[in-house]
Amino acid sequence: MLGHYNKKQNKMDENNIKIIGTHHFQDKKDIEEHIDSFNPDIILIELCNGRISMMNNPEQKQKQKFSILGLISKSVNKKAKKEGKEFGSDLKSAYRMAKEKNIKIGLIDRPLVETNVFFKAVPLSEKVAMLNELRKFSNKSIKIEDIINEVENTETEDILKQLKQKCPEIFYYLITSRDEYMINKIKGYLYDNQGKRILIFIGKGHEKKIKDNLGFNQTK
């Protein structure tokens, strides 16, 4: 059956399953092209109910308690808006277009509340290092376009390796543990929707691990 995930063989029929790794400033038109060309029955997105709620009710962001994750998001958003861009435009566009086209949606990211709780376990030294990097980012004349170019022209593995070396615990909670969470969510959707065309939008940093785990690009 097309689109069937074979747990035993850990292989994936790629005819009906497609994973798109995006950077979080991706143009709306790029997302739309992926959706229109693949014509999915279901779209799985690296979002959670908490993020959807904040998308629909921006004032909720103001009521959030202080967190380093929130500070990072606020800092990037501020710089992005100055350049006429929107942080998270890729996933937001995928969600909104799926709604407009009446395509079934699956949210696969770990709830934001849980991520923030786990993040408290990060050592103070790494949090300070992250805040220092954030301060440099805010003060520098780095443009969002420069960041996009670096992401598009640098091996994702190299970028992840740098983060892991500098902040191993942050890397675990932001990347590794979320990879595992999303893999399990995706497998559940694939098992429950065999034969359906499923399009999956995730950040580039998660793409390789998830594809490898699901058996993409493996010889049968």
Set out the residue ranges of the language-model regions:
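Compositional signal for N-terminal targeting/processing segments
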Residues: 1-220
